[in-house]
From Swiss-Prot:
Localization (cell): Cell membrane
Segments on the Cytoplasmic side according to the record's topology features: 592-603, 661-682, 751-762, 813-852
Protein name: Taste receptor type 1 member 3
Signal peptide positions (record): 1-20
Length: 852
């Protein structure tokens, strides 16, 4: 703690601030301790002219003052004093500090780095084969602030395995443990920040962007990381370039100017600028003078809070600025700490109280530490009192203190006495270290990084200077508050930065040129769908699925077959009822009048058998509707053809009898007529049916029909049907019936009817005509109709065939039986005498044939 005298002086200084006399702030950048921490801070900036004209290994002059660098140095000073005043981390020990100016230049930063590594109490770095017992002047180094400097000092300190904790260097390359084994940082790596930036672009649908980076290691590596992250998220970089540093030659300046003109003339509305402060300042300075149209600028952390960039005249017209800023704990006591020390530094009594001290050995090497720090006021530094990076400095000091606590095995009573800790011994306890700072628990991962949240910041202009407003947060995933964002557009609408419009539902991208973000939208055809919004090709549905045009999903195919409830089937069932009813009615009449001349002339029992066969044909129709099964497919053709063969064989016997009686001589007629009735007639029927059985058996064995599911016939359904494997065998199965029908037609077509007798030939002729018309029409209709309706076509053909035979042959006889019974005589049907009801059945077949 500060002593009572110092506290009194502090109170006096606050009540009676200095009157502009030189401060003694530069004298407070060094303090002795048991263990000393080195500090590298950008207290000033070197003149560009001095850097360009440097021809000797001398240091450039640092003239310009950096308020942020001084505040960060004071944050380290405050953290060390806090630790010394506590009794939990290093009880009984005091930390010291040795803070130097880097001038934001590697050339300048190397000198204090050499001082840090000099042997304690000297300015020399001796050459040894083994530095295990080497004790440098400092135990660890806090800083530097930039990746450019850390790349230089990091390798240097890593050779001696001296822990170095940066509070601002964020390059991903510094995570390489092989190259930088002793490097740590209290800020996340650039990869985290760039991941957040890529998520931001994806969140707002910006996939056509420009990416610019400063022409240094920081910018080049940042662009490389962003390119990979953008490609993985489908973000296209339309224009890419490096922004030269202020001292670059004209050729490099011309290249970035060309890139800016291309961006201005293209549809790109979003620019990622991953650059250092000076490069960003140079870029915006040129953009303002060139009147670049307003864009959305995604800023890197390096220039997002830069007063140098914010204060550019005309910067408000450059558009919307968004960027991610590391979130740390608030150091509420820090502003008061700064005010107190500035007031004390302005008090002559306090400066005198510091006492006379010897000039440090390093003063001859690096010169006065910060002469410009003795000429500032509170107003010069007030803008950066709440700078986000201040906490990173504070946390860096606490990380080293915690590692030293662990190395010394300190406890509440103190730290056990032992030999001074070497830097490499401290380093062993830095890996995967967990420590507390400002109420937060932090941890170094295996690469020496800490995991911290980012706040999404928006520049909101208030007068000539923007203020940073929180509009989101990133902690592995992005959360934005869109309503808080004020866009630069006139209607405050989110800018659109796309090469092509967003494809609609069910459309995929057909890429044009080299960029995947430039494309035409193509509709997905039926049977395919768009799986993801970024698809470049439609995904085909499975064979059991279907989809309409421009679909985003597939639907399960429903099985399609000739169902019982379909209108065509219901109509055919009505037709079946009619046909079956007529068959049963005719059969009943024939059985009732079985001994009458009309029934005997029609064949008697054979006529009844023919009607039974027609009834079975009607019933076989019921095998066609419904879901196909292997048994149904095998039974359909035989069970429909065999009964029809039985019916046609009885009609063939009628036709043969008529032909024999009408066209052959009486001797032949008498001999053959007996064979066409009685047992021989049944033998003919049996032979015909056996032939049909043989053909059907061959059809079923050689080419058995099978149940198949056709996934392509119907657009939205799976067609389940009985597939005919051979249409030739299918036709041969009809051969017996066709032959019988043809013989019937030939036997009756040219037969002359006798006056006064019933014309039996005419009915048979028209019955066969009905058969042929039905089945001849069936062939082209079956070939052209949809497969799902083919069973209905065959059902219709069978029923029409039955109805044709009934209408032409049986129904006229039923009409005579019911309404003209007077014609039911032997003379009219059989040609016998009055009362001869049996006619030819009495054995007088030959003579009756002659009377006909």
């Amino acid at each position: 703690m500060l002593g009572p005298a110092v506290l009194g002086l502090s109170l006096w200084a606050l009540l009676h601030p200095g009157t502009g006399a030189p401060l003694c702030l530069s004298q407070q950048l060094r303090m002795k301790g048991d263990y000393v921490l080195g500090g590298l801070f950008p207290l000033g900036e070197a003149e560009e002219a001095g850097l360009r004209s440097r021809t000797r290994p001398s240091s450039p002059v640092c003239t310009r003052f950096s308020s942020n660098g001084l505040l960060w140095a004071l944050a380290m000073k405050m953290a060390v004093e806090e630790i010394n005043n506590k009794s939990d981390l290093l009880p009984g020990l005091r930390l010291g500090y040795d803070l130097f100016d880097t001038c934001s230049e590697p050339v300048v930063a190397m000198k204090p780095s050499l001082v840090f590594l000099a042997k304690a109490g000297s300015r020399d770095i001796a050459a040894y084969c083994n530095y295990t017992q080497y004790q440098p002047r400092v135990l660890a180094v806090i800083g530097p602030h930039s990746s450019e400097l850390a790349m230089v000092t990091g390798k240097f300190f890593s050779f001696f395995l001296m822990p170095q904790v940066s509070y601002g260097a964020s390059m991903e390359l510094l995570s390489a443990r092989e190259t930088f084994p002793s490097f740590f940082r209290t800020v996340p790596s650039d990869r985290v920040q760039l991941t957040a930036a890529a998520e931001l672009l994806q969140e707002f649908g910006w996939n056509w962007v420009a990416a610019l980076g400063s022409d240094d290691e920081y910018g080049r590596q940042g662009l490389s990381i962003f390119s990979a992250l953008a490609a993985a998220r489908g973000i296209c970089i339309a224009h890419e370039g490096l922004v030269p540093l202020p001292r670059a030659d004209d050729s490099r300046l011309g290249k970035v100017q060309d890139v800016l003109h291309q961006v201005n003339q293209s549809s790109v509305q979003v620019v990622l600028l991953f650059a250092s402060v000076h490069a960003a300042h140079a870029l915006f300075n040129y953009s303002i003078s060139s009147r670049l149209s307003p864009k959305v600028w995604v800023a890197s952390e390096a220039w997002l809070t830069s007063d140098l960039v914010m204060g550019l005249p005309g910067m408000a017209q450059m558009g919307t600025v968004l960027g991610f800023l590391q979130r740390g704990a608030q150091l509420h006591e820090f502003p008061q700490y700064v005010k107190t020390h500035l007031a004390l530094a302005a008090d002559p009594a306090f400066c005198s109280a510091l006492g006379e001290r010897e000039q440090g050995l390093e003063e001859d090497v690096v010169g006065q530490r910060c002469p410009q720090c003795d000429c500032i006021t509170l107003q010069n530094v007030s803008a950066g009192l709440n700078h986000h990076q201040t906490f990173s400095v504070y946390a860096a000091v606490y990380s080293v203190a915690q590692a030293l606590h662990n190395t010394l095995q300190c406890n509440a009573s103190g730290c056990p006495a032992q030999d001074p800790v070497k830097p490499w011994q401290l380093l062993e306890n830095m890996y995967n270290l967990t420590f507390h700072a400002g109420g937060l628990m932090l941890r170094f991962d295996s690469s020496g990084n800490v995991d911290m949240e980012y706040d999404l910041k928006l520049w909101v202009w208030q007068g000539s200077v923007p203020r940073l407003h929180d509009v989101g947060r990133f902690n592995g995933s992005l959360r934005t508050e869109r309503l808080k964002i004020r866009w630069h557009t006139s209607d405050n609408q989110k800018p659109v930065s796309r090469c092509s419009r967003q494809c609609q539902e069910g459309q995929v991208r057909r890429v044009k040129g080299f960029h995947s973000c430039c494309y035409d939208c193509v509709d997905c055809e039926a049977g395919s769908y768009r799986q993801n919004p970024d698809d470049i090709a439609c995904t085909f549905c499975g064979q059991d699925e279907w989809s309409p045009e421009r679909s985003t999903r597939c639907f399960r195919r429903r099985s399609r077959f000739l169902a019982w409830g379909e209108p065509a089937v219901l109509l055919l069932l009505l037709l079946l009822s009619l046909a079956l009813g007529l068959v049963l009615a005719a059969l009943g009449l024939f059985i009732h009048h079985r001994d009458s001349p009309l029934v005997q002339a029609s064949g008697g029992p054979l006529a009844c058998f023919g009607l039974v066969c027609l009834g079975l044909v009607c019933l076989s129709v019921l095998l066609f509707p419904g879901q196909p099964s292997p048994a149904r497919c095998l039974a359909q053709q035989p069970l429909s053809h065999l009964p029809l063969t039985g019916c046609l064989s009885t009609l063939f016997l009628q036709a043969a009898e008529i032909f024999v009686e009408s066209e052959l001589p009486l001797s032949w007629a008498d001999r053959l007529s007996g064979c066409l009735r009685g047992p021989w007639a049944w033998l003919v029927v049996l032979l015909a049916m056996l032939v049909e059985v043989a053909l059907c058996t061959w059809y079923l064995v050689a080419f058995p029909p099978e149940v198949v599911t056709d996934w392509h016939m119907l657009p939205t359904e799976a067609l389940v049907h009985c597939r005919t494997r051979s249409w030739v065998s299918f036709g041969l199965a009809h051969a017996t019936n066709a032959t019988l029908a043809f013989l019937c037609f030939l036997g009756t077509f040219l037969v002359r009817s006798q006056p006064g007798r019933y014309n039996r030939a005419r009915g048979l002729t028209f019955a066969m005509l009905a058969y042929f018309i039905t089945w001849v029409s069936f062939v082209p209709l079956l070939a052209n109709v949809q497969v799902v309706l083919r069973p209905a076509v065959q059902m219709g053909a069978l029923l029409l065939c039955v109805l044709g035979i009934l209408a032409a042959f049986h129904l006229p006889r039923c009409y005579l039986l019911m309404w003209q019974p007077g014609l039911n005589t032997p003379e009219f049907f059989l040609g016998g005498g009055p009362g001869d009801a049996q006619g030819r059945n009495d054995g007088d077949t030959g003579n009756q044939g002659k009377h006909e």
